[in-house]
Regions:
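Extended alpha-helical scaffold and adjacent linker segments that couple domains
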Residues: 2-195
């Protein structure tokens, strides 16, 4: 019951019912309703883009960009292509990073790519992606709870608002750390492969 009831509170060996929903279970409920395509991927794209900032030596950094939108030019330096979460690198047979990188390397949309040696790929670690998505869902759920309490949609008191903000900030820090741990595999094409 403790894990399922929205209005049951527990602290050490004490239990009580309240008219306000338990925030932890509210977060779990909201987490289940987060859309991967509409909410999760845009958040991850934005957060990964922020990690690189503006000071870098690349002609461009393309985060989760389709091959047609990655320019085929020499530019001032190489281009970094950050592969999406569904193209994780693994040392096992489930390695999708190579096939996704090859698609972008070989073609720019429907046309063959001419300057293949100008691309470097950053792939997510296949084993960490599921933890990353889970943490991003937790962050989005806490963020929506804080927004609802502040707007008055969710009836909670000041202590619950502060608890929600602490949980949101903790989830935000964990998400930032996991993003840095996830995108760690650098794939650089070699001359034999490019030919």
């Amino acid at each position: 019951l403790r894990d399922r009831l929205h209005y049951l509170y527990a602290e050490q060996d004490r239990y009580w019912l309240d008219t306000k929903p338990n925030l932890r279970r509210e977060m779990e409920s909201r987490k289940q309703n987060i859309s991967e395509r509409d909410d999760l991927i845009p958040l991850l794209k934005d957060r990964v883009s922020r990690v690189f900032g503006r000071n870098h030596q690349f002609s461009g950094i393309h985060v989760f960009t389709p091959s047609a939108d990655v320019p085929d030019d020499y530019g001032t330096g190489p281009r970094l292509v950050v592969l999406p979460t569904n193209a994780g690198y693994s040392r096992t047979d489930t390695n999708q990073a190579f096939s996704e990188a090859e698609k972008i390397l070989r073609n720019r949309g429907d046309q063959p790519r001419q300057k293949q040696n100008r691309l470097i790929f950053l792939a997510p670690d296949f084993d960490v992606v599921s933890r990353l998505k889970e943490q991003a869902r937790i962050y989005l759920a806490w963020r929506s709870i804080v927004a609802d309490i502040e707007s008055g949609t969710l009836n909670q008191d000041l202590s619950h608002l502060n608890q929600s903000k602490r949980s949101r900030d903790g989830a935000d820090q964990s998400l930032t750390q996991l993003i840095r741990e996830t995108w760690k595999w650098l794939l650089a094409p070699v001359e034999d492969f490019v030919k």
